[in-house]
């Protein structure tokens, strides 16, 4: 059994090693597939009373008149989902959950690691619980936070942990299991990054799911500082909707991975969500942008049960808020617009088209965060870990320059009528 000190140690190790692990060669099935945002919260935490900014940008009443996600099952392949949280307990189908972590796990000192429940409803890391909340947290007393698809059902699949015991092989198994459990949408907020050759085993599992008309949403990755461009998997596979992070101004977040594989963006900065044991905290990363998009996919799938997965993806991209005529390497087709996706839906489309759909809407005034953090704690939470020359660096102030550069690039592209 883990003690409080052990859990704290896990979080510290995850913070220190997540980025370094993500750039390792992960073409082999036995290489860890790490969660791409470590987070920094205490569990449980107090409730967030207001309405988070990522929800303020959406007319929720109008959205939910169209769809609440009822009848759609969303698989969260992650570190587990803690059903002790009152907003998640009614959202999770614990009977369909699965724990794919190896048995008899030990840490570097040979001590046994608590594997968790067999149905995937244990989450000592907190990552999967955060992801699930963004998708389908039920309305709760005393908080303005709620999932974007509040009637969708979560299938908890525990495939990874703080020590990186998840592998490309178990990720492939998790995708197959999700399909067997009738998932309509799969969210994967982690990557197996290999610039040389992706893993055939994982690609085959993705293809099987797509053939069953399952929408697969994956985080693009958090190694975007300094203009770094690399493919991440499974996000880069054909048919997978790769999600970048946007900020409150609908610009690419400084850490967000860019590349031709990026299909869309969603809020990923100061994202309020659920944590193990109850309460909420704020976190950053494409890990939390992906479930935002997965939730909208669930809403569309619930409303249009006969639409193919390719048509659902195209609908999200076509109706996204964008400032250029077509896609770019920063935010794909733009920042997802849930209401437009559910209201400009007279007929399905197979592919998004350039030209129309340029909205460039003014971002809403963000709500203040009242999470009881000290300035030092906030700075630590906002820090982004990147790898340069094999060393892990903390970059907390580079984002402004990167965002300005991206904005200038967009202006030049708009004037020239092209994309990057």
Residue ranges and their predicted role:
Residues 187, 304-401, 416-418:
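C-terminal subdomain of the subtilisin-like protease fold in secreted/lumenal serine endopeptidases
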Residues 132-135, 268-336:
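Hydrolase catalytic cores
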Residues 78, 144-162, 186, 308-320:
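Short helix-loop-beta-strand segments that form the rim/entrance of peptidase-like active sites
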Residues 37-151, 180:
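Active-site core segment of subtilase-fold serine proteases
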Residues 1-36, 386-406:
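Secretory targeting and sorting signals
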Residues 409-420:
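Cytoplasmic C-terminal tails of single-pass
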Residues 159-233, 279-284:
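Substrate-binding/access-modulating region of protease and related hydrolase catalytic domains
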Residues 103-113, 245-287:
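Catalytic-core environment of secreted peptidases
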């Amino acid at each position: 059994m883990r003690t409080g000190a052990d859990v704290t140690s896990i979080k510290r190790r995850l913070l220190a090693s997540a980025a370094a692990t993500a750039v390792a060669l992960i073409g082999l099935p036995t290489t860890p597939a790490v969660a791409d945002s470590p987070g920094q919260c205490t569990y449980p935490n107090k409730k967030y009373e207001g309405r988070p900014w990522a929800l303020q940008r959406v007319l929720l009443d109008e959205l939910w008149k169209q769809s609440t996600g009822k009848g759609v099952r969303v698989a969260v392949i992650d570190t587990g989902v803690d059903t002790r949280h009152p907003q998640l307990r009614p959202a999770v189908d614990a009977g369909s959950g699965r724990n794919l972590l190896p048995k008899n796990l030990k840490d570097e000192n040979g001590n046994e690691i608590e594997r968790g429940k067999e149905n995937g409803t244990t989450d000592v890391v907190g990552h999967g619980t955060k992801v699930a909340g963004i998708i389908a947290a039920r309305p709760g007393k005393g908080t303005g936070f709620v999932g974007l698809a509040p009637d969708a059902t979560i299938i908890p699949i525990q495939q990874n942990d703080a020590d990186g015991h998840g592998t490309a092989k178990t990720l492939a198994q998790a995708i197959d299991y999700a399909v067997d459990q009738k998932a309509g949408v799969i969210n994967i907020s982690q990557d197996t990054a290999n610039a040389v050759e992706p893993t055939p085993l994982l690609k085959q599992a993705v293809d099987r799911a797509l053939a069953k008309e399952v929408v697969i949403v994956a985080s693009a990755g958090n190694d975007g500082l300094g203009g770094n461009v690399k493919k991440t998997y499974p996000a880069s596979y054909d048919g997978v909707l790769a999600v970048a992070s946007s900020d409150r101004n609908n610009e690419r977040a400084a850490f967000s991975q860019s590349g031709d594989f990026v299909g869309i963006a969603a809020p990923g900065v100061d994202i309020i969500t659920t944590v193990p044991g109850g309460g909420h905290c704020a976190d950053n990363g494409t890990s939390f942008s992906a479930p935002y998009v997965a939730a909208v996919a669930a809403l569309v799938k619930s409303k249009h049960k006969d639409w193919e997965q390719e048509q659902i993806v195209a609908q999200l991209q076509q109706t996204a808020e964008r400032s250029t005529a077509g896609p770019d390497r920063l935010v794909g087709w733009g920042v997802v617009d849930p209401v437009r996706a559910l209201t400009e839906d007279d007929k399905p489309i197979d592919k998004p088209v350039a030209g129309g759909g340029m909205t460039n809407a003014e971002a809403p005034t963000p709500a203040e965060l009242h999470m009881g953090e000290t300035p030092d704690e906030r700075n630590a939470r906002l820090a982004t870990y990147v790898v340069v020359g094999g060393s892990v660096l903390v970059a907390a102030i580079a984002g402004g320059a990167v965002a300005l550069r991206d904005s200038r690039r967009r202006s030049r592209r708009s004037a020239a009528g092209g994309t990057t």
